[in-house]
Regions:
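Short, Lys/Arg-enriched N-terminal segments with co-localized hydrophobic residues
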Residues: 1-9
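Non-catalytic, conserved peripheral segments adjacent to functional cores
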Residues: 10-116, 125-126, 131-133, 143, ...
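Extracellular beta-helix/beta-solenoid repeat scaffolds
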Residues: 119-121
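Histidine-centered acyl-transfer/condensation active-site motif
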Residues: 140
């Protein structure tokens, strides 16, 4: 009974945030809304191209317990900030294949952190640890987010590139 009450409270709180913050479904899983986009632009160079990006962008991002953020990567660094709900485990695979697990949450004495940085070009995914809970976080990207800089992982590519992380990749990618 206690777990049913907890689940109901968490579901209501998640729905409250989705409604009050006007969050929409995110393509990689969860809900989001952009809340800031810098008016200042900077140039970023890529091979044979020169792009302009906002200096910085920020979103609210909410995951409900069973939802996951699938493996993806960005061409900019992204800071994740914990706001409310249950702890979130973030899985990061760097360009050399090293896996790092970071837990965002309120339990500082247990090693959880309020924010973390995911470096550009690293593959990352996330999940709420307690599947009966939710997590509200903020994501700040600099240089600013642009959907053309977002790459949702291809399972086959990740499995070929990082075979030692097969079970995690299979769980956090589309078949």
């Amino acid at each position: 009974i206690v777990s049913q009450i907890f689940r109901k409270i968490m579901n209501e709180k998640a729905k409250y945030y989705i409604q009050k913050l006007q969050l929409e479904k995110h393509p990689e899983g969860g809900y989001f809304r952009e809340i800031y986009r810098s008016g200042e632009m900077i140039s970023i160079e890529e091979p044979k191209k020169n792009f302009k990006r906002n200096v910085s962008t920020s979103i609210y991002f909410l995951l409900e317990g069973p939802q996951i953020s699938k493996f993806h990567r960005l061409k900019s660094d992204e800071l994740w900030h914990f706001y409310d709900g249950g702890s979130v485990k973030v899985y990061v695979i760097d360009e050399e294949g090293k896996l790092t697990e970071i837990i965002l949450g309120k339990k500082i004495e247990e090693g959880e952190v309020f924010q973390t940085v995911i470096k550009k070009n690293n593959w990352f995914a996330a999940e709420v640890i307690n599947k009966r809970s939710f997590a509200l976080i903020g994501c700040t990207v600099s240089p600013g987010f642009d959907f053309s800089d977002f790459e949702l992982a291809d399972r086959k590519y990740l499995l070929e590139t990082f075979p030692k992380h097969k079970s995690l990749i299979s769980e956090f990618t589309k078949p």
